[in-house]
Amino acid sequence: MEIDSYPEITITDMLAIIRNTCELYMKYGARSSKKVDYFHEEIIKQLRTIFTDERYIVAQEYDVPSLNPSGKKKCDIVVLRDNIPVIVLPVKIIMTNYKQNKNNYFENQIGEVTGIKLANPTINVIPLNIYMSKTPYLNTNKVITKFESITYSDIAIYEKYKEHRLFSDVINYIIDVEHENVVNETYQKIPKLIGFNNATGYVSLRAIMERLNV
């Protein structure tokens, strides 16, 4: 694959995308797909500047063959070469209540990826996960009951699956933040994004794609 020399997403660009994603979450709520759709679209825009050859297509919400009861899995972002999926990016953006749902997030993702890899042994799976260093835990009324700290140790297990080649690479970003809201307040203010945590430094999509043989 020849990488084209289009401008890549910088650290500043990515932080702006994440900030806009947070704004959409606050405006439309957790159940709305707007924040996820926006984030996916921004990543797809970048991938389309990388995979410019007409053999490649970058798709959103694409059904990839999977060893599961339905025989397929709808994947967030997929790169196809000659109409065959060659890269899958499962995306997760964690806004609240992470540690309560941590095992479910991980086990669901591993199960989905395993089915995809069994049906497509040579496919490249690259999870893209966004976390906040300080994540609010909300009750059913969206009131903050506490803040949870997320550190690299919470997500280090992903590297084990990379070592065993279930993942071709892993994009885990912890964003250092300062929250405007405090405990016992309704969560309704966008946190201030300080930057990428030192443990999960920013790497451009272009650099990651250059490592793949697709």
Where do the language-model regions lie?
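Charged, often glycine-rich, active-site loop that binds/positions anionic groups
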Residues: 61-77
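Non-catalytic C-terminal interaction segments of nucleic acid-processing enzymes
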Residues: 144-214
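Hydrophobic, Leu/Ile/Phe/Ala-enriched alpha-helical segments that form helix-helix packing faces
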Residues: 39, 43-51, 113-120, 150-162, ...
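Catalytic cores of nucleic-acid endonucleases
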Residues: 93-146
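Nuclease-adjacent, charged terminal/linker segments that flank catalytic cores
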Residues: 1-16, 22, 202, 208-214
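Acidic-basic catalytic patches of nuclease active cores, encompassing PD-(D/E)XK
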Residues: 7-62
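Phosphate/oxyanion-binding active-site loops and adjacent basic polyanion-contact surfaces
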Residues: 32-40, 70, 101, 105
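Active-site beta-strand-loop-beta-strand hairpin of nuclease catalytic cores
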Residues: 78-89
